Amino acid sequence: MSFGILFEDEKYDGNDIRRVGEEFLYIELAGHHVESFEACDFEKIVCTDPHSYNTFKNEYPEVDFEEFADDPIMPFEYDEKWNKDGEVDVLHWTQAVEELVNDGKLELSGTELEYTVTYHDPCHLGRYNDEYEAPRELIRATGCDLEEMPRNRSNSFCCGGGGGGLWMDFDEEPKPSEERLREALEDTDAGPNIEKFVVACPMCMTMYEDGRKTGDFEDDIEIVDIAELIVEAIGKEERANLEVAA
């Protein structure tokens, strides 16, 4: 897979800025990014954050850049609808890596790891974009035993970080992140045998790491990103191949 990054031209996508009411700053960021995209030669955008994925895929194409292109405050001149026909394929990284797994590019046997895990569906990947299978396929590809929480897929329970929640103090008890971790350890079929709470969103990672501490779950469960499982599984597969070769 050939890829590039925007380096200094990569700024914040603007999702949370927009959610807390800074619409014009959001448009400024959107205009900057689409001009940067137009200067590059590529076929797909791969996002590591479901919020960026949703913003690039669904919200940038809705922006009327022509309305703001001549505004002296706005630092862009782009005056067309961006990606209105979906000519640029926007992917979450789990979708891109799922393609590699299905094509055999990562050479995973599906037996590398033996953890019992549960998976949390991020709002912007799941409910907003109906992507439920790619993360689960990657977890299974590592060999992990995936146990579902009662609230999963379209009924998933938010981590509490969206809409500016990441920067707010929650007065209620338990916090959303604490309640979700309790659900993982008490309401899944595996119960306390759940070893890892798997996420696919950096905001969820932050919220659940905090909830793990404030909810006193530090000795009970580990928060990991799917990417960490894949890296560990690839490492085990490579070591196994070296042992066979020796």
Language model regions located:
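Iron-sulfur cluster-binding electron-transfer modules in prokaryotic oxidoreductases
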Residues: 1-246
